[in-house]
Amino acid sequence: MSNLIEVVDLCKTYGAGDTRVDVLRGVNLAVAEGETIALVGASGAGKSTLLHLMGTLDRPSSGSVLFGGEDVFRKSDMDLAAFRNRSIGFVFQFHHLLPEFTAEENVMMPALIGGMKRSAALGPARELLSEVGLAHRLTHKPGELSGGEQQRVAIARALVLSPRLLLADEPTGNLDMKTSDEVHETLSEINRKRGLTLVVVTHNERLASRMGRTVRLVDGRIEV
């Protein structure tokens, strides 16, 4: 199985001199197409920083991220933003849904930003909401949904442009155990159905156990 994403000698430093903080220190990681990985470790170990760099939300201090063999950080900021919107889906601890829009409108948003017409985006949005068990909530606004439903809308939104990679940063951190399990099952089912590559930062051992591989970070390095 070929690698979808490769992290090569990745370093990330903030500040300088006495305020310098080395968050990532030469991280190497290969993720195969369709693989599921849990990134675990203590707070401050660099998990979210690594996820953000894999998702091109930030640029590294040194090292590279190869996506399908291409060094993505050779792209301009504009090209990188277009690549990110097209190729990578994100789910965060807080759903970041737009409160004035319905579930289906929130799911359509990345497609509309990418230039797709509303008429073309509506069908995929409804199909995804059905896939995550929310066919009966299409026209409900975020304030009318439970926490688990809001997070499932966020998952559907992350998938609307059919990305090859889904990155999730503590996706169940704000949810109770029962609701967390429902979201875990949604993520697992999406991987099974779509063959989507999934990398999850989590402190939740139950979620980590559902992933095909667990990678532990300690002080900015991958524990071997």
UniProtKB/Swiss-Prot annotation:
Q: Which GO terms describe its cellular component?
A: plasma membrane
Q: Which InterPro entries match?
A: AAA+_ATPase, ABC_transporter-like_ATP-bd, ABC_transporter-like_CS, ABC_transpr_LolD-like, MacB-like_ATP-bd, P-loop_NTPase
Q: Where does ATP bind?
A: G41, A42, S43, G44, A45, G46, K47, S48
Q: What topology does it adopt in the membrane?
A: Peripheral membrane protein
| Cystine residue pairs | none
Q: What does this protein do?
A: Part of the ABC transporter complex LolCDE involved in the translocation of mature outer membrane-directed lipoproteins, from the inner membrane to the periplasmic chaperone, LolA. Responsible for the formation of the LolA-lipoprotein complex in an ATP-dependent manner.
- Summary of subunit composition and partner proteins: The complex is composed of two ATP-binding proteins (LolD) and two transmembrane proteins (LolC and LolE).
Can you say what this protein is called? Lipoprotein-releasing system ATP-binding protein LolD
The root-end lineage is:
Bacteria, Pseudomonadati, Thermodesulfobacteriota, Desulfuromonadia, Geobacterales
